[in-house]
From Swiss-Prot:
Its cofactor is Zn(2+). The gene is rnz. It is an enzyme of class 3 (hydrolase). Keywords: Endonuclease, Hydrolase, Metal-binding, Nuclease, tRNA processing, Zinc. Zn(2+) 1 binds at H62, H64, H145, D216. One of its GO terms (molecular function) is zinc ion binding. Binds 2 Zn(2+) ions. It comes from Parasynechococcus marenigrum (strain WH8102). It catalyses: Endonucleolytic cleavage of RNA, removing extra 3' nucleotides from tRNA precursor, generating 3' termini of tRNAs. A 3'-hydroxy group is left at the tRNA terminus and a 5'-phosphoryl group is left at the trailer molecule. Zn(2+) 2 binds at D66, H67, D216, H274. SUPFAM superfamilies: Metallo-hydrolase/oxidoreductase (SSF56281). The active site is at D66 (proton acceptor). Homodimer. This is Ribonuclease Z. Belongs to the RNase Z family.
Length: 319
């Protein structure tokens, strides 16, 4: 997995930061998922090396404009490109479907590919999986914000152990399609009648990696619980610690709240994003100051910037 930040500002864009959007690359399946889609996100795609044609799923955290105003245009452009035959699944708060229908219908926009909207609320309230396939699961939880908001956690299922090709050769197993079967742990009958158990040629299972997107919210226990042991936590950090009172009023997080969540949850790495546009160069407090505040509590913290890409790596706490 690899994440690419397409927008890291809160509320409004700045010259250096667009509003919220995070792309999750899944190279093993030539697929990409998007978390939030603020205004201008499709322009950010054009400035990156991401391929919009690989977009398969979109997860919306909440319905504030800086997280959704780019979605109708992006979906329309995807339709015009004719490169989305498999369709797109969207997940988000209850009003997401009516928002999209209103924008697309009133603009006479035709989406020429399958588009399905799923509500996140039932899975968040019941603690069930929002999505699952052979390789990945997605869970979500309600956050504490002025409107219904959800954090999303993506977990990769355990990976098969590494295939011992030298051992296979020593047993006289000829290379070819049979190797793929053995790598999957299947039993294979060779031409000479021998039956080879693939599990004897594979090492132990390897843990998959995990990433969680947590925005918008003030510090809350639900976020800590969902984040436990996650490899990469992407957490909003709208305000500096000195403005904690404002953060509580607006139900946003400070840099120290994000770090506290990471520390209590035992995550591998923290990336802070969704910074207030007030923290621009020349102001008394800069984004680097927010980074230092977070690192004082959780040292393995990075400051997200537009077009920053991070490989999701397993941490020792990964569950």
């Amino acid at each position: 997995m690899q994440v690419t930040f397409l927008g890291t500002s809160s509320g409004v864009p700045t010259r250096a930061r667009n509003v919220s959007a995070v792309a999750l690359r899944l190279p093993q399946r030539s697929e990409m998922w998007l978390f939030d889609c603020g205004e201008g996100t499709q322009h950010q795609f054009l400035r990156s090396d991401l391929r919009l044609s690989q977009l398969r799923r979109v997860f919306v955290t909440h319905m504030h404009g800086d997280h959704v105003f780019g979605l109708p245009g992006l979906l329309a452009s995807l339709g015009l490109s004719g490169s989305c035959q498999d369709g797109v699944d969207l997940y988000g708060p209850d009003p997401l479907e009516s928002f999209l229908k209103g924008a697309l219908n009133t603009s006479s926009t035709r989406i020429g590919y399958p588009l399905q909207v799923h509500r996140s609320r039932p899975a968040a309230e019941q603690g069930t999986l929002l999505f699952e396939d052979d390789e990945l699961t997605v869970r979500c939880t309600p956050l504490t914000h002025r409107v219904p908001a959800y954090a999303y956690r993506v977990d990769q299922k355990p990976l098969a152990g590494r295939f011992d090709i030298d051992k296979a050769r020593s047993l006289g197993i000829p290379p070819g399609p049979v190797y793929a079967q053995l790598k999957r742990g299947e039993s294979v009958t060779l031409e000479d009648g021998r039956v080879i158990d693939g599990t004897t040629l594979c090492g132990p299972e390897r843990p998959g990696v995990s990433v969680m997107i947590c925005t918008d919210t003030v510090f809350c226990d639900a976020a800590v619980e969902l984040a436990r042991g996650v490899d990469l936590l992407i957490h909003e950090s709208t305000f500096a610690h000195a403005e904690a009172e404002m953060a509580f009023q607006k139900q946003h997080s400070t840099s120290t709240m994000a770090a506290q969540t990471a520390a209590e949850a035992g995550v591998g790495q923290l990336a802070i994003t969704h910074l207030s546009p007030r923290y621009v160069p020349g102001n008394p407090v800069s984004p680097d100051d927010l980074l230092k505040e977070a690192q004082a509590i959780f040292p393995n913290t990075v400051l997200a910037k537009d077009f920053l890409s991070l490989d999701v790596k397993p941490c020792c706490n990964s569950s």
